[in-house]
């Protein structure tokens, strides 16, 4: 087999390459002809050029002796213009070719389907997300080690990698006065991802200060740095953008400065269908991938060291299943021989979002975003005793119900997850919901249920990987606590919008508005929410990193159990949800796993 790339030592483009250099040269350097790599060999193949894929590719190819091929279904989109570059255009690109728009199954909650927005292009969902930069609670990350058996996956280590990825700018005096707070000890300043305050240049709205005053009267903290491991209360937050307000996406930061490395190649417009496995040894070994655009025209490329799956929490489990790695019951249904029986595609955990919006008076005009990370008790308010009663009496029942619905495979193991969540909420006051405030022309809250107890799944439904036929069922709100938690958080947002200092700027509610009486009960809210929510597009867990006996698909080095030379390195592997926007976690994951890969590479030489 021929070698695809030169391993000669050259000086790569500087990491500090100005971000405003657009695509001059890069698109011409990206491969589009599959025959350019077919039949050849590299050290590492990365299936997926999103956040984790490009971060890992950049880190591995710092060593000029390591050759890497990234295969991505989309194309280079970072210079598309305001639709990508402007965070204030969030949502406008949905429905375009840069959005996978995966469709769920018909949901049992409401007999409707939903679309899962996911970036299709180099950079993945960093092309289309809202760019919010926060970090989880320390105890959440610590539990990955203490509860799930992932040695080294604790707050101290993961936070260090997260800071390594970050190039933060402190807020200026105007931004601090508006409500930003910056703790230098919680930020990196020499990393790759540019992070700083969003600022259109307009005056900031007084509504954020009013919200802070309102919650302070409730005993809730304000103006905390949400990157320090204890997100709680109301604060403004930084975003992934440059000082000139251009989006800092993964392709712009990890590929654009490095695409001229002779040991890195990127093939676009191609799907990875399955992993090629050598089954002649006691343990199957990944030796390459099959890729293409349809089954009549496929190609193989080979990996000397490892195959790394980075196609996202919806697609990486599909690639495994098409490779014969998954639940035998699923693979038998589509006629694929089982090579390794693992609970692939289970433990899917996504959050939900509901809007509560009001008109504002002219005095409230101005820019600004903030978030209220609310604890379990703050979310439920007067309903907290009933909510605690559910936590204390229903965990076993919920686990059995989730297994019966196909969201997990072992009720005893799932109860361990639920007990971990209960510990977070009851003993550590981990944020349970997020009320995300945007003041662009309205008092617009979007409310998230951060810690879902429901479990869903993703499984292939056809043996042809290029048809991408699969069942994606997050099973939203099939757990009663999730539904009532979303209802309580939404009710809280309505109450805050017309309370205390916020009243000054309140000019009438538009959503739910007349669709839900102002004195609606929690049950009324719950019924309304079933038909008026959307997914949050933060699905995790479908190739969970945990002990095998707990339901793990990969170990603490992201290696697939029972297969040599194969890892999953993306959002499939977190075993839990977190009280945070997830980019900080995913960048840390990619860098930490990259170091594990490099250590294995060094030991092989």
UniProtKB/Swiss-Prot annotation:
Obligatory cofactor(s): FAD
Name of one Pfam family that matches: GMC_oxred_C
This protein's GO CC annotations: cytoplasm; extracellular region
Entry EC no(s): 1.1.3.4
Catalytic activity: beta-D-glucose + O2 = D-glucono-1,5-lactone + H2O2
Protein biosynthesis as UniProt keyword: no
Signal peptide bounds: 1-16
Active site (record annotation): 538
Entry GO MF terms: flavin adenine dinucleotide binding; oxidoreductase activity, acting on CH-OH group of donors
SUPFAM superfamilies: FAD-linked reductases, C-terminal domain, FAD/NAD(P)-binding domain
GO biological process, one term: secondary metabolite biosynthetic process
Binding site for FAD: 51-52, 72, 125, 129-130, 132, 272, 571, 583
Annotated positions binding O2: 559-560
Domain of life: Eukaryota
Function of the molecule: Glucose oxidase catalyzes the oxidation of beta-D-glucose to D-glucono-delta-lactone and hydrogen peroxide in the presence of molecular oxygen. Acts as a critical factor modulating pathogenicity by controlling transcription of genes important for fungal secondary metabolism and infection such as those coding for enzymes involved in degradation of the host cell wall.
Name this polypeptide is given: Glucose oxidase
Native species: Aspergillus carbonarius (strain ITEM 5010)
């Amino acid at each position: 087999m021929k070698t695809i790339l030169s391993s000669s030592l050259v000086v790569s483009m500087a990491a500090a390459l100005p971000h405003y250099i657009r695509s001059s040269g890069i698109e011409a350097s990206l491969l589009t002809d599959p025959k350019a790599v077919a039949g050849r060999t590299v050290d590492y193949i990365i299936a997926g050029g999103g956040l984790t894929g490009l971060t890992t590719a950049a880190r591995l190819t710092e060593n000029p002796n390591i050759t890497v091929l990234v295969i991505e279904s989309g194309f280079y989109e970072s210079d598309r213009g305001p639709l990508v570059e402007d965070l204030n255009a969030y949502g406008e690109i949905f429905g375009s070719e840069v959005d996978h728009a995966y469709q769920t199954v018909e949901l049992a909650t409401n007999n409707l389907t939903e679309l899962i927005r996911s970036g299709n292009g180099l950079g993945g969902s960093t092309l289309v997300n809202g760019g919010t930069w926060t970090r989880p609670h320390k105890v959440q990350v610590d539990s990955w080690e203490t509860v799930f058996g992932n040695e080294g996956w604790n707050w101290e280590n993961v936070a260090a990698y997260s800071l390594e990825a970050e190039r933060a700018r402190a807020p200026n005096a105007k931004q601090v006065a508006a409500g930003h707070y910056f703790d230098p000890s919680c930020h990196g300043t020499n990393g790759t991802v540019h992070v700083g305050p969003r600022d259109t240049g307009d005056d900031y709205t007084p509504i954020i200060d009013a919200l802070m005053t309102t919650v302070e009267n409730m005993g809730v903290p304000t103006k905390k740095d949400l990157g320090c491991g204890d997100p709680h209360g109301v604060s403004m937050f930084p975003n992934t953008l440059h000082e000139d307000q251009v989006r800092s996406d993964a392709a712009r930061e990890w590929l654009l400065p490095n695409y001229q490395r002779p040991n890195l190649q990127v093939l676009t417009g191609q799907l990875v269908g399955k992993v090629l496995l050598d089954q002649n040894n006691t343990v199957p070994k990944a030796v390459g991938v099959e890729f293409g655009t349809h089954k009549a025209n496929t190609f193989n490329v080979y990996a000397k060291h490892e195959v790394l799956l980075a196609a996202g929490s919806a697609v990486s489990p599909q690639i495994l299943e098409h490779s014969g790695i998954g639940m035998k019951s699923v693979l038998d249904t589509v006629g694929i021989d089982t090579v390794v029986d693992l609970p692939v595609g289970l433990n899917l955990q996504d959050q939900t979002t509901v809007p509560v919006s009001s008109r504002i008076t002219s005095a409230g005009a101005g820019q600004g975003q903030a978030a209220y990370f609310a604890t379990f008790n703050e979310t439920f308010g007067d309903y907290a005793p009933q909510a605690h009663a559910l936590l204390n009496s229903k965990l076993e029942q919920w686990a059995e119900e989730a297994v019966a619905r196909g969201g997990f495979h072992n009720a005893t193991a799932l109860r361990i997850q639920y007990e971990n969540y209960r510990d977070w909420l009851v003993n550590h006051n981990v944020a349970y919901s997020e009320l995300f405030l945007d003041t662009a022309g309205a008092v617009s809250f979007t409310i998230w249920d951060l810690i879902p107890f429901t479990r869903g799944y993703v499984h292939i439904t056809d043996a042809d990987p290029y048809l991408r036929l699969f069942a994606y069922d997050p099973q939203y709100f099939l757990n009663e606590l999730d539904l009532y938690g979303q209802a309580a958080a939404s009710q809280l947002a309505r109450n805050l919008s017309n309370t205390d200092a916020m009243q000054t700027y309140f000019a009438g509610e538009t959503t739910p508005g007349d669709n839900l009486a102002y004195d609606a009960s929690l049950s009324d809210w719950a019924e309304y929410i079933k038909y008026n929510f959307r997914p949050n597009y933060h699905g995790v867990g479908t190739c969970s990193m945990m002990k095998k006996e707990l339901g793990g698909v990969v170990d603490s080095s992201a290696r697939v159990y029972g297969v040599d030379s194969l890892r999953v390195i993306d959002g499939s592997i977190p075993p839990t949800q977190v009280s945070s926007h997830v980019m900080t976690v995913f960048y840390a994951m990619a860098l930490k796993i990259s170091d594990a890969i490099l250590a294995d590479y060094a030991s092989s030489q």
